[in-house]
Amino acid sequence: MIGYLNLVYAGLHEPPSSWTIIPPDFTISRHVEVLLSVDSTIYIVDNLENIDQRISRGPFTHLAASPNGKGLALLSYSGLLWVVSTDFQRSLAEFNTKEVVGVDGPVRQIQWCANDAVIVSWDGLVLLVGPFGDTLQSVLFIAHFVRGLKLSYRYFYSGSTFAITELDGVRIIGPDVCDFVQKVPGTYHRR
């Protein structure tokens, strides 16, 4: 017999455009919560109830929960990256991905870089969006990020990438490299 999670029926008549999971350790209900992008809103579904968050900013092509379960990154069909608290009460950052010069094709992936920033990736380009919408574009090397400055460096990978969120950063795997991006530790800021 195959085990499965019994979720409350969310009233879906078609598949969600995107979804993500928040583990039970990070939810008030202490149940696994699945966030579903349906039409212009987000449903939070667990094994007891489903709650329409009544958000009118969707639909969203990509959803990603931060490793600590406190933040969400949502990418709309219009290309707006919206970073918000998981209770949808605090907007942390907004960034229009359509304004990135040199991007070819749709966004392939969004992932968190620890709990501090979000990675947006296209074929051959990775963009790091910081807590206030600051950006750092990279491929092979991530420069020292100084708080308060808007940095924009452009480096390209030789092909598609895949990003994996980790507790202290994000691993970016390309055709010929594996990079690890993390926040510069506080001890380096004082030098």
Residue spans of the language-model regions?
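Intrinsically disordered, low-complexity regions in large eukaryotic scaffold subunits
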Residues: 2-191
